[in-house]
Amino acid sequence: MKIAIPLDEKGMLPDRFGKYSSPELRRDGNNICSFPIEVSGVPEGAKSLALSFVDYDSIPVCGFAWIHWAACGVSPDTALIPENASHSGEFSFVQGSN
């Protein structure tokens, strides 16, 4: 299976998906707009997909790997989890909360 996310010319997530996002993409000072995820090559017979976005670079800052996002119940027929799926309500999946 292969996943792809949009990266800028430096190989980083674009600012709109991180701490430099614009005010309309923030809640309580934190970015809330999830990046799109392209999915391909899902194994035949898969019944469901799950994802986790774990930030291991946070260990020196807070002492543990920060889990930014966890979700399950994604259809194996999904080719694209759209931008802002975490908040738009337009994409069917179950999300974890922290």
Language-model regions: role of each:
Residues M1-N98:
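N-terminus-centered regions that define maturation/targeting leaders and the start
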